Amino acid sequence: MNITNCTTDASMVVRPKTVTEKMLICMTLVIITTLTMLLNSAVIMAICTTKKLHQPANYLICSLAVTDLLVAVLVMPLSIMYIVMDSWRLGYFICEVWLSVDMTCCTCSILHLCVIALDRYWAITNAIEYARKRTAKRAGLMILTVWTISIFISMPPLFWRSHRQLSPPPSQCTIQHDHVIYTIYSTFGAFYIPLTLILILYYRIYHAAKSLYQKRGSSRHLSNRSTDSQNSFASCKLTQTFCVSDFSTSDPTTEFEKIHASIRIPPFDNDLDHPGERQQISSTRERKAARILGLILGAFILSWLPFFIKELIVGLSIYTVSSEVGDFLTWLGYVNSLINPLLYTSFNEDFKLAFKKLIRCREHT
């Protein structure tokens, strides 16, 4: 997402890059781009080829992977060329298309994270009712909404840009906007509002999970103290222990449906009679949940917050940054498209099995 204000200043003029510097930068960015393509392609293939992953929650993950793949295929390569050559050599029309695709795809990737957080929040706090509403059609509508909002956020500059062919062709490809209202509209719509919503949702998700752990531990303790209760539940099907990885990655609905559907929970391990042991297990799960949520939020904030702070202060003419700083912060945001497939699938056993299956298939071919 390259929305740098076109303010120039003599103090911001920097020396040209040496050949060695250009090679190192090019190699680094090519590696990032290649890994982003491979990882997101693997997520898409895993979901498409694994029937067990055909769930509405995973459709959102798949759509996120498609969006991040578009960033890697359509945006990153031209950015590498632009940075290495120190000038834009593809003409005005390609510049316009590239900038529009860049803004749309990056905004869409961010909004996908917001929608995924919202889906998980509904699945955890209102599991039984939301399970009936959580359909492929609903996931499709959420994805369509995300793309629509992204287009409305990124397209307005097209209406006030000059559409005449420049002669000679432009040597710089940056969105030039002096519209303060649009700067505020785009930065808040693409990042600050989604960030606020994501923080609120994951905060509530964590507390819902923490409360659930405590309730399950308390229920087990009560059931273990009653022999009659044990006998009365002997014929009941044992529900599985809630797994942090399910809640933190793909589809937590199933476990929460089981938990919320059962007012009374059958006894599990009799060696958990001591309150200290139960509290220790609960605390371990809470810490694991906190770590996973911390990774998700931390990666998102570290990737995009510096860029959008820069965009706000530059767009409001508070400060001007060099092209090197702008490029670094832009690519820091792009790296989020590399991190997303790792964070949103690595903690889920179904995805791990699907990836292993894909690797085995490639080895046999």
Swiss-Prot record:
GO terms for molecular function: G protein-coupled serotonin receptor activity. Detected in the brain with the greatest abundance in the hippocampus, followed by the olfactory bulb. Lower levels are detected in the cortex, thalamus, pons, hypothalamus, midbrain, striatum, and cerebellum. GO terms for cellular component: plasma membrane. G-protein coupled receptor for 5-hydroxytryptamine (serotonin). Also functions as a receptor for various alkaloids and psychoactive substances. Ligand binding causes a conformation change that triggers signaling via guanine nucleotide-binding proteins (G proteins) and modulates the activity of down-stream effectors, such as adenylate cyclase. Signaling inhibits adenylate cyclase activity. Glycans are attached at N2, N5. Residues 48-59, 119-138, 203-291, 348-365 are cytoplasmic. The keyword Phosphoprotein does not apply. Ergotamine binds at D102, T107, I175. Gene3D superfamilies: Rhodopsin 7-helix transmembrane proteins. GO terms for biological process: adenylate cyclase-activating adrenergic receptor signaling pathway; adenylate cyclase-inhibiting G protein-coupled receptor signaling pathway; positive regulation of MAPK cascade. It is found in: Cell membrane. A motif (DRY motif) lies at residues 119-121. This is 5-hydroxytryptamine receptor 1E. SUPFAM superfamilies: Family A G protein-coupled receptor-like. Signal peptide: none annotated. A motif (NPxxY motif) lies at residues 340-344. It is a multi-pass membrane protein. Keywords: Cell membrane, Disulfide bond, G-protein coupled receptor, Glycoprotein, Membrane, Receptor, Transducer, Transmembrane, Transmembrane helix. Disulfide bonds join C95-C173. The gene is 5HT1E. Residues 1-22, 83-96, 161-179, 315-324 are extracellular. The chain crosses the membrane at residues 23-47, 60-82, 97-118, 139-160, 180-202, 292-314, 325-347. Belongs to the G-protein coupled receptor 1 family. It holds the Pfam family 7tm_1.
